[in-house]
């Protein structure tokens, strides 16, 4: 992917999990994650994906989630309806947080203290919490397949930039835990904390539980 981008768009920046980053202050920046969900990949669980995002002036504008085993590809473009294999999709979601299905890759991705406490509190508000879907959980939310909410922490920009246009284009909401936009300039301030929801009401209810009122942070307890 990097070779193709460099050849076709030499002025564009590239922000990648692999091989580092170049020109990240460019007008257009590609954000790449060749394999999101490495553990799923190496164990043959088809919940990993290739993530390709394009940011314009730091804002995620185009996103692709590609699951090669299941032959599923979600394409999101800001201002345009998200498509799965060419067909429009729309997030649905339960009307209340108490009925929602919550996803996260692992409960061990939340740092001890603020993150773990607030995620645990949110888990107490929902119907059920499930784990282990990696980027595929966001695709399920965008497609209206019964996943309502994804809340994660300790993410890199390459983990979520491609997901934002996919969620927004499906009618969902996706921000950091304070309800602020996920952009390149705000990546550090967002602390890798992400909240994606199938609709605005669910998102607002989740943010009320997650919101970082004091800017607190703590030691991470990450399971790589």
Task: Tell me the role of every PLM-derived stretch.
Residues 24-83, 98-100:
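DPxDG-like acidic metal-binding loop motif
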Residues 1, 5, 38, 67, ...:
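Residue-level signal for inorganic ion chemistry
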Residues 16-18, 86, 133:
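Short loop/edge segments at beta-strand edges and connector loops
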């Amino acid at each position: 992917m990097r070779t193709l981008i460099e050849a076709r768009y030499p002025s564009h920046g590239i922000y990648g999990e692999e091989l580092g980053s170049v020109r990240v202050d460019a007008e257009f920046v590609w954000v790449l994650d060749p394999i999101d969900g490495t553990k799923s990949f190496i164990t043959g669980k088809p919940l990993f994906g290739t993530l390709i995002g394009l940011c314009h002036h730091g804002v995620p504008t185009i996103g692709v989630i590609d699951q090669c085993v299941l032959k599923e590809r979600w394409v999101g473009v800001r201002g345009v309806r998200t498509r799965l294999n060419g067909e429009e999709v729309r997030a649905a979601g339960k009307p209340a947080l108490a009925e929602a299905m919550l996803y996260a890759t692992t409960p061990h991705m939340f740092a001890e203290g603020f993150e773990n406490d607030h995620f645990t509190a949110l888990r107490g508000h929902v119907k059920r919490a499930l784990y282990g879907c990696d980027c595929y959980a966001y695709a399920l939310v965008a497609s209206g397949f019964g996943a309502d909410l994804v809340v994660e922490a300790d993410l890199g920009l390459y983990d979520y930039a491609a997901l934002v246009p996919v969620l927004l284009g499906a009618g969902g909401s996706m921000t950091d835990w304070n309800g602020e936009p996920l952009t390149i300039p705000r990546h550090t301030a967002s602390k890798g904390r992400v909240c994606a929801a199938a609709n605005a009401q669910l998102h607002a209810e989740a943010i009320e539980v997650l919101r970082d009122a004091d800017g607190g942070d703590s030691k991470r307890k990450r399971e790589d």
